[in-house]
Amino acid sequence: MDIDPYKEFGASVELLSFLPSDFFPSIRDLLDTASALYREALESPEHCSPHHTALRQAILCWGELMNLATWVGSNLEDPASRELVVSYVNVNMGLKIRQLLWFHISCLTFGRETVLEYLVSFGVWIRTPPAYRPPNAPILSTLPETTVVRRRGRSPRRRTPSPRRRRSQSPRRRRSQSRESQC
């Protein structure tokens, strides 16, 4: 089976693969961040959002993987084999978990649309030859809040507002869940 854990969130393994492996913080840092920002929601019996659920699952998977690694470390006699298993877990599985944790924490923190826009922007930046791209990569926290990701195949509506409606003079605020609320 070829399962893409990002598909239901509008992203893909391929889209995240543009980010270099050293881009993602350590699992310890990501777990600390998730705990500091979302502990109450993650430990709650209530369903908060698909991102909270995915984050819970990634954290549980990492815990089980660490239990397995501990068991292997205790029960595998050959030091070379033990080192191979530890290395494989840290390099391959660790990267996948770091990507999952980063994606869902970022979506909860910045909003899914902003994270998707960042992934697309970074993917375009990294594939552009160095001579033709800006020297610095896009930064997630500096993307404008008005970022809109359009679905392929849909053309934007081209309509001016009717003269009867008055437009507010203040800029429109993007609807998103408050960072203060846990869910």
UniProtKB/Swiss-Prot annotation:
<dbReference type="InterPro" id="IPR002006">
    <property type="entry name" value="Hepatitis_core"/>
</dbReference>
<comment type="function">
    <text>Self assembles to form an icosahedral capsid. Most capsids appear to be large particles with an icosahedral symmetry of T=4 and consist of 240 copies of capsid protein, though a fraction forms smaller T=3 particles consisting of 180 capsid proteins. Entering capsids are transported along microtubules to the nucleus. Phosphorylation of the capsid is thought to induce exposure of nuclear localization signal in the C-terminal portion of the capsid protein that allows binding to the nuclear pore complex via the importin (karyopherin-) alpha and beta.</text>
</comment>
<dbReference type="GO" id="GO:0039619">
    <property type="term" value="C:T=4 icosahedral viral capsid"/>
</dbReference>
<dbReference type="GO" id="GO:0075732">
    <property type="term" value="P:viral penetration into host nucleus"/>
</dbReference>
<keyword id="KW-0238">DNA-binding</keyword>
<keyword id="KW-0946">Virion</keyword>
<dbReference type="GO" id="GO:0030430">
    <property type="term" value="C:host cell cytoplasm"/>
</dbReference>
<comment type="subunit">
    <text>Homodimerizes, then multimerizes. Interacts with cytosol exposed regions of viral L glycoprotein present in the reticulum-to-Golgi compartment. Interacts with human FLNB. Phosphorylated form interacts with host importin alpha; this interaction depends on the exposure of the NLS, which itself depends upon genome maturation and/or phosphorylation of the capsid protein. Interacts with host NUP153.</text>
</comment>
<feature type="region of interest" description="RNA binding">
    <location>
        <begin position="177"/>
        <end position="183"/>
    </location>
</feature>
<keyword id="KW-1035">Host cytoplasm</keyword>
<keyword id="KW-0597">Phosphoprotein</keyword>
<feature type="repeat" description="3">
    <location>
        <begin position="170"/>
        <end position="177"/>
    </location>
</feature>
<dbReference type="GO" id="GO:0075521">
    <property type="term" value="P:microtubule-dependent intracellular transport of viral material towards nucleus"/>
</dbReference>
<feature type="compositionally biased region" description="Basic residues">
    <location>
        <begin position="149"/>
        <end position="176"/>
    </location>
</feature>
<keyword id="KW-0677">Repeat</keyword>
<dbReference type="GO" id="GO:0005198">
    <property type="term" value="F:structural molecule activity"/>
</dbReference>
<protein>
    <recommendedName>
        <fullName>Capsid protein</fullName>
    </recommendedName>
</protein>
<keyword id="KW-0167">Capsid protein</keyword>
<dbReference type="GO" id="GO:0046718">
    <property type="term" value="P:symbiont entry into host cell"/>
</dbReference>
<dbReference type="GO" id="GO:0003723">
    <property type="term" value="F:RNA binding"/>
</dbReference>
<feature type="modified residue" description="Phosphoserine; by host">
    <location>
        <position position="162"/>
    </location>
</feature>
<feature type="short sequence motif" description="Bipartite nuclear localization signal">
    <location>
        <begin position="158"/>
        <end position="175"/>
    </location>
</feature>
<feature type="repeat" description="2">
    <location>
        <begin position="162"/>
        <end position="169"/>
    </location>
</feature>
<feature type="repeat" description="1; half-length">
    <location>
        <begin position="155"/>
        <end position="161"/>
    </location>
</feature>
<dbReference type="GO" id="GO:0003677">
    <property type="term" value="F:DNA binding"/>
</dbReference>
<feature type="region of interest" description="3 X 8 AA repeats of S-P-R-R-R-[PR]-S-Q">
    <location>
        <begin position="155"/>
        <end position="177"/>
    </location>
</feature>
<keyword id="KW-0945">Host-virus interaction</keyword>
<keyword id="KW-1177">Microtubular inwards viral transport</keyword>
<dbReference type="Pfam" id="PF00906">
    <property type="entry name" value="Hepatitis_core"/>
</dbReference>
<feature type="modified residue" description="Phosphoserine; by host">
    <location>
        <position position="155"/>
    </location>
</feature>
<comment type="similarity">
    <text>Belongs to the orthohepadnavirus core antigen family.</text>
</comment>
<feature type="region of interest" description="Disordered">
    <location>
        <begin position="136"/>
        <end position="183"/>
    </location>
</feature>
<dbReference type="InterPro" id="IPR036459">
    <property type="entry name" value="Viral_capsid_core_dom_sf_HBV"/>
</dbReference>
<keyword id="KW-1163">Viral penetration into host nucleus</keyword>
<keyword id="KW-1176">Cytoplasmic inwards viral transport</keyword>
<keyword id="KW-1144">T=4 icosahedral capsid protein</keyword>
<feature type="modified residue" description="Phosphoserine; by host">
    <location>
        <position position="170"/>
    </location>
</feature>
<keyword id="KW-1160">Virus entry into host cell</keyword>
<keyword id="KW-0694">RNA-binding</keyword>
<dbReference type="GO" id="GO:0043657">
    <property type="term" value="C:host cell"/>
</dbReference>
